Amino acid sequence: MDMNPFRTLVRTEGVRLYRDLPWRRTRDPYEIWLSEVMLQQTQVARVETRWVEWLDRFPSVFALAEAGTAEVLAAWQGMGYNRRALALKAAAEQIAFDYDGVFPTEVKELVALPGIGPATAQGIRAFAFDLPGVYLETNVRTVVLHHLFPDVPSVPDKELVPIVEATCPAGLDSFETSIDVDGGSLGAYAVPQDEDDTPRSWYYAMLDYGAHLKKTVPNPSRRAKAYTRQSKFEGSRRQKRAEIVRMLLAAGELGEGMDAPSVH
């Protein structure tokens, strides 16, 4: 199958629909990793605010690694599962102390870190390092399903992976950057309408076009076999657990080395 018409369409729509989000103005893998985790369960508009607040509080992977558990959980409140915050801290500790603050770029090393699955690993690789890979995220699924599987129900990921892999461009021949490890910042790097056909610009186009499709057509990602509907928060165990954590934090009873409580 000739994928060039599909790629041209996605690139064109990506330019038209580009979202100038704050985590797109950095190549710092810590900042990009944080955005990937926050976006797993929270709307983009809310993440825009909370991402900045988090980085004001924990500006680098070292700052997060050295922070207390209670402080991390307090900063995470209202952002979904507390275990994601605990995994962020645990992974930050490994990156800071086992990797001297330098993020690994290989998928097998990234997924070995707490809380980092294949999609998050590929997001870090694409957006921080411009490396090619299979970034199979819900908006990416939406685009592929809408155009290439328009009438097919329950499409398994194994059928999507080869297409996502084939359409992702190769990385640049050279990638030069310098990281201020202490400050955790690489400076501004905006890529709207990026002329280079790179993994980073390609997946931005896929994400933005997919988000647009979800608002304008019946959600194609529901036809993915991997699709799961988020359970209601009201009256759920997640709500009870979040309330317990808030109470413990307010009372100062969630100390160092303590995990957030379980609700069964």
Label each PLM-derived region with a short phrase.
Residues 2-9, 13-239, 247-263:
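Catalytic cores of DNA base-excision repair glycosylases
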